[in-house]
């Protein structure tokens, strides 16, 4: 293994002293950017047009990092964070910025990254935005059992740490779920097995509210009865996930969460997607609906068109595309998601789509689905779709819609599309995670004639 010299951070007293910095912009991770002795300094928590007091914590050759100590001259975009856990929880790192300011920053950062790293400039479309608070339909809470007090707490991980920050509510979680945290923690503390419980997942679905408890050993009858009683009192569905990954309803019946799409589309009846707590779903239900609607508008699927949906998951885009008449092929790398997608297609009576399991980072030349298509939809994880795009010559889609959760990989992959003769026609922000620095986007590429 190659070894490289790694310089130790400069920890001189002069560098660690508190200093004043003028912040002129944000980086794409939401940290303020200032200049100091010819270096770029990143200051999390600082905003553009602010003068702040900060302490250098890390020195590199071309940049440094600093800890915000005090805001001396605040930005007009600075607001007081509403969450009492803001300083400790690792979740909402832009709560100190107005919602309008957040979105303006994210949109500008997206355009800048695409221009800088892909040389791509497209027609910027209005951002897809929704509620700034109580937008998450799903959250995983860690459990923290204190051996001294014998009490269990629910919470989120601290920033860049495994430490659990106990919470009793959450301002970005759907209101019914946020209101459930405190009574649910009280319930868990009444269980004999409280010291051996794993994480808890809360889900707000179209068919009810769900709580999933990870258990490391079977619960006794008294504990099961307490869970069943709580479920009935609070009108929620509680299920347990065992060490084998299997799910069991506390009342003997397992109900799975469901959400609908196309329920406001005049050209089609709704589709219902069932998922298990282990499946990936977009956590912002409102934005997911508008995101799917925009993808359908851009692709304009027609009966008989062959559309390939790579990284299709359990059919979030595939089923609506098929519902509008296209012949859809969905490919996904997680076998459980493929099985769920097939079940969802069957439950919705859709026979014009086929799902395949496959490694989309591997050689795709011999895959049964590989061949000429009319249109392509990509919705990859943060790593992007670089390997899949190497097979564009065999697929030759006229249009490509790329849904991205990482602007850096989107820019890299956009360069591949541009090299293959595609032109960026539309680019827009998807504000899936308000109050955070996370940037999601949708881009439309068309093959130049």
From Swiss-Prot:
Q: What is this protein called?
A: 23S rRNA (uracil(1939)-C(5))-methyltransferase RlmD
Enumerate the Gene Ontology biological process terms.
rRNA base methylation
Q: Which UniProt keywords apply?
A: 4Fe-4S, Iron, Iron-sulfur, Metal-binding, Methyltransferase, rRNA processing, S-adenosyl-L-methionine, Transferase
InterPro entries (alphabetical): 23S_rRNA_MeTrfase_RlmD, MeTrfase_TrmA_AS, MeTrfase_TrmA_CS, NA-bd_OB-fold, SAM-dependent_MTases_sf, TRAM_dom, U5_MeTrfase_fam
Catalytic reaction list = uridine(1939) in 23S rRNA + S-adenosyl-L-methionine = 5-methyluridine(1939) in 23S rRNA + S-adenosyl-L-homocysteine + H(+)
Which Enzyme Commission numbers does its entry carry? 2.1.1.190
Annotated S-adenosyl-L-methionine binding sites: 282, 311, 316, 332, 359, 379
Residue positions binding [4Fe-4S] cluster: 83, 89, 92, 170
What would be an example GO MF term here? RNA binding
Functionally, this protein is described as follows: Catalyzes the formation of 5-methyl-uridine at position 1939 (m5U1939) in 23S rRNA.
Membership in a protein family: Belongs to the class I-like SAM-binding methyltransferase superfamily. RNA M5U methyltransferase family. RlmD subfamily.
The main enzyme category here is transferase
Residue intervals of the TRAM domain:
12-70
| Catalytic residues (positions) | 405 (nucleophile)
Q: Which organism is it from?
A: Shewanella sp. (strain ANA-3)
Which Pfam families does the UniProt record give? TRAM (PF01938), tRNA_U5-meth_tr (PF05958)
